[in-house]
A protein has these predicted regions:
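Multi-pass alpha-helical membrane architecture of UbiA-family
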Residues: 2-330
């Protein structure tokens, strides 16, 4: 009897140790997931923050005076936009380790130290949470979120790798940015905000489309700047980017065309969407700032670190342009 009791106690001891080991293992996995999530929040918020701002500005364009009533929806769709952008960056880094090892060594080391499965879990969680929030706000917002997720997967997945195809890399990036801007307007409409149906499509107000297009076209400045900064790694990886395909001068011409396209759109849509004179002045001033910035950076293309550090300036200018357009369209 004592022997049987001893064996039973030993089994219980082994089971207890196994349970403790399992709990410790789960705790370690959770800490690892949390650490990499915090790392990406810290390092990827700078390129991502402009997405929720554009989303909220688009929401504000539709809701106007109802914004105080719509604060929860505006906040929610802004969070969804941020999560969508963050998840896309995490997934892109996951599929881009080799190139990042050349262009961004610190980032590559952090990514390589994480298990592929762990990073995929984070991506699925972020995409899933963003889609859920969008669905709660409106079904139309949910559909745009799903389209964005599909586009993000096609952009980075090795089977499709749209980021390696010129000029699809920039076109897809710009389209994704436009979708996140449009997400705000669609969420406001789905949340019950009214808008004037005059000069609008049956689905979206023209002003929202105008705002989204203006936000997206800025990525024909921002993306080539990233290409200039990462030209060494892209050349080794065999990627076709603006400076590698068009050359430096033609790439700069593409970048300079953006403010002139926005000015042309402003003239064409002045009466159609009732653009205000104050907004027009703000748009012109912002376009002049953009031209001046491109002219300044064109003389410093031999310094990749400087170019990389100035990419945030383009984001500031893009947000400034969105605010100028909001003033013009309200």
């Amino acid at each position: 009897m004592e022997t049987k009791s001893g064996i039973g106690d030993e089994k219980l001891f082994v089971e207890d140790n196994s349970s403790i080991h399992m709990v410790k293992s789960l705790h370690q996995q959770f800490r690892s997931q949390l650490q990499i999530f915090i790392y990406y929040v810290k390092t990827r918020t700078p390129p991502v923050y402009c997405y929720p701002i554009a989303t909220i500005l688009s929401f504000l364009l539709i809701s106007k005076t109802q914004i105080l009533e719509d604060v929860p929806a505006a906040f929610g769709i802004g969070i969804a936009s941020y999560l969508l952008g963050l998840a896309t960056y995490v997934y892109n880094d996951l599929t881009d380790i080799d190139v990042d090892h050349i262009n961004r060594k610190e980032q590559s080391i952090v990514t390589q130290n994480q298990s592929r499965r762990g990073l995929i879990i984070i991506v699925i969680f972020l995409f899933g949470l963003a889609a859920t929030i969008s669905y709660i706000i409106s079904f139309s917002a949910f559909l745009i979120s799903i389209i964005f997720i599909i586009l993000g997967i096609f952009y980075s997945h090795p089977k499709f790798s749209l980021k390696s195809k010129f000029p699809l890399k920039t076109i897809v990036t710009a389209t994704g940015a436009g979708l996140l801007s449009l997400l705000g307007g669609v969420a406001a409409i789905g949340n019950g905000s009214d808008y004037d149906t005059l000069h609008n499509t049956t689905i979206f107000p023209l002003s929202t489309i105008y705002l989204a297009f203006s936000f997206s076209i800025f990525y024909f400045i921002q993306s080539p700047m990233g290409d200039f900064a990462d030209i060494k790694g892209d050349r080794i990886a065999g990627r076709n980017t603006f400076p590698l395909v068009l050359g430096i001068n033609r790439t700069l011409a593409v970048m300079l065309s953006v403010p002139f396209i926005i000015l042309t759109m402003n003239g064409m849509c002045y009466n159609l969407v009732h653009i205000s004179i104050h907004g027009t002045v703000a748009i012109v001033i912002t376009c002049l700032l953009v031209v001046g910035f491109i002219g300044w950076i064109s003389n410093r293309l031999d310094d990749p670190l400087l170019i990389k550090s100035k990419r945030n300036n383009v984001r500031y200018l893009n947000i400034l342009m969105q605010m100028a357009l909001l003033i013009a369209l309200l």
